[in-house]
Amino acid sequence: HIMQPLFDEKTMEVHKKHLQDRTNVRSPLATNEVGFDPRTGFPNNFIGGHVTMKPVIASHFNYRASLIRQMEWHGIRWRALPSESRDLYLHFRSLDLSAVDRIMLDCYSARGPKPRQPSCMLRSLLIMVATKCPTIPQWVETLHVSPFYALLSGFDPDDVPGVGTFYDFLDRLWALSTPNFSSHIKPPYKRELKKPKEKGAKAASVEKESVADLIVRLSTTVFSANQEAYGLMFQIFRTCFVNESIRRGLVRPDRLCIAGDGTPVVTAARFRSHHTCDCWKKGIFNCNCNRFFPQPDCDIGWDSSREHWYFGYDLYLLTDADSQLPLFPALHQASKHDSHGFCEAFFRFRALAPDLKPASLLLDSAHDSMAMYKLCQREGITPYIDLNLGNTKKTTDYHGVTLGPDGIPVCPAGLKMKSNGNDLNRQYAKFRCPLNNNGTCTCEHPCSDAKYGRTCSIAMETNIRLYTSPPRPSDEWKLMYNKRTASERVNKQIKLDYMLEACKHHCTKYLVCPRLSYHDADPPFQMEGPVIHMTVA
């Protein structure tokens, strides 16, 4: 509904005729494109004795003032707009993107044609995502048809940027010289696809490097925002959105609880490649020569939710579990295992946002490995990771006590013993008789002379993966782990509500575009509309 023109054809003709009658009068937005310094009287872009073509750093107050004057100039009353357009107006009128002009100042040359304001370009892309417009050409057409969207973006309706201008802006956000992470020319893709045996299970890892070796390698790697492909975009995301959420009390850095999860991103229906040799002319069709891959960063992965193979990416997202707001996205190949995807995202997030140190970590059973617990122990993080019984031996023996695959002792009657908390001073996990009823053992064949039944204490250092603090079966652990579903809700919102999979681009650069996540919240003070939090997907 909000993609329809705000005026009918007759009203638009009257509107255009009214503007033609005032051709000699410049609109308020046009007269405020370049401000003047009140001390010198020169324009703000008059630097070093000449006029520079770098973007003018404008404040959010100037944008709001120009927006109000422009809407009055064009006869648009925001209270008379449809409810969807009115919500957009309230959201983006309060969204401060003035820091984008300062951050991207070095991305523009001092010579050449005058550029568009980076804050207006980014705001227009965010409005495009909010209105679920799938492509940039369709969005440019919408800006020409509906003046409201042009005004809300910060443009003059008679001077709307073209399609190439938007793609040029996306090129400036991308730090690499190539549009993809890898080369188009690769050896032929030959991998045996093995479907998981259990329903809902994830595919086995195809990584040649173990999680422990990957953690060691990433720990010694230096990550810089200037070297990362999306480093500039994350700097904008951190400055304009994450810091604003921290200021409003939605994200609390002192007790940050991070939930991580990966989600499939489908980009094509099938895997495609082209021959770069002439072996087919000789009758050789299955040669081992290099192939040309249109989407070199994509491959085949397993979607455990829909239970089918897909071609595309794997989006791994670190989410604040308390506020259900995204913190850091990472885009990998579809075959990337979640444990490796987490390590890639975690170490980059730690390097690009060193002041945001997580206090707890919520992960599913795909991340269950001893190396992950040792990483959390070294970083001072409390892990809440679901146990993967496939990574544990069936039965073990600990000083005459039989342990199950989940590390819980099993009494001679074949019953699992109940957790009795942890002794943190002595670093012991305590267990008691499962038939203990109000301090009395009700077992018909007690295995201990004690009145309250048999007890068992196991050193937590024996296996920090099995004996966690708080204990895995406890109510405290379960209550905390239930917050992990926040990452799944955010993934769903990015993919479905904001149409991430609708971006059918053949390169990673144009897929890495701003995506919005709207979350209703009750901040400690009054604000206009829901909180806006952006993810770079």
Feature-to-residue mapping (PLM):
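Polybasic low-complexity intrinsically disordered regions
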Residues: 168-360, 365-378, 386-388
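Dynamic "connector" segments at or just before major functional cores
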Residues: 35-121, 126-130, 151, 157, ...
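Short hydrophobic targeting helices and cationic amphipathic motifs
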Residues: 19-22
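Helix-centered, glycine/charged polyanion-binding patches within enzymatic domains
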Residues: 374-491
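Basic, amphipathic alpha-helical segments enriched in Lys/Arg and hydrophobic/aromatic residues
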Residues: 477-537
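DNA-recognition alpha helix
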Residues: 138-153
